[in-house]
Amino acid sequence: MKVYLHSPVYSLGDTAYGVEESALASRTLSSADKLREAGFETHHVCSPDTGVQDLAARTATQLGECLDTVSTVVFSTCLPMNGSVGSFADFQESRDVKHLMDFPASRLQAACGLQDTQIIGLNQQACTGMLGGIRLAKALLQAETDVDDILCITADRFPPNAIYEQSYNLISDGAAAVVVSRIERGFRVVGCHQITNGALVQASDDEAVGTYFNYTHRLVQESLAKIHGTISDIDWIIAQNMNVKAWQILARLLAFDSERVYFDSLPEVGHVISGDNVINLKKLDDSDAIRPGEKLLMLMAGYGMNWQSVILEKV
């Protein structure tokens, strides 16, 4: 059974800051010059009263009538704290753990009028959670005939006073979503793959960077092997937003044209936790640069350590 993905949408934190402003405010570890050299210009930070449920609702409502056919929501969060919007202070006062189970997916269901939907929460996959959600949605549609369209959504915000830099990448709060369906529209989901190395769960920034190239190269080769393909079958790589030099190196390792590695949203939005692939997919698709039949490889690395991929084909 073929499964498709369509309607990528996203939203960002309330306030945009330039790298100079955030460096001066100690929101970053690297200097503004270093961040600019890596390709970053601005990032987006939520106001204190904006929660992940707000980011998710802002994103999902952009889908309009597409929500009418959604039967299941797969809601992924990178930070475990974003898996509940309840008050820890209320728990401490009452000692009642219900305050720790105020799930943003349930809030989203109510806010968007998705009364008859099933809810699945996905975490412990860090920045790869969105691609993991797409993989799960594909498997559900192929395994359960009574499941209709699936909303895959991710939303995360850093806590107040957090450092908005990880592994030398400038972070933005934000959310992103796609609809996964049996209806032929947008892109066919050709294949999905995941690698996890739990021994690296507490990897430092330098260790994360050091393992990135080896594991991402392995991820690409194993992903292509699963669909009996080679790198020459891929027309575009839809990348995560990270240091531009890293992608130049990786493209050479993969023997892939670096001009076909797309992460043009990087200067404007930074690294939007689990949302980069969706944001870049939307921007590239909106440009009409993708031709029917072309294959796209979406890649993401995340703490845990996790690496995930999704291969798409434009319909």
Q: What is each PLM-predicted segment?
A:
Residues 56-71, 218-235, 254, 284-289:
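Phosphate/pyrophosphate-binding loops at sites that engage ATP/ADP/AMP, CoA/4′-phosphopantetheine
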Residues 284-292, 311-315:
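Catalytic phosphate/nucleotide-handling subdomain of diverse soluble enzymes
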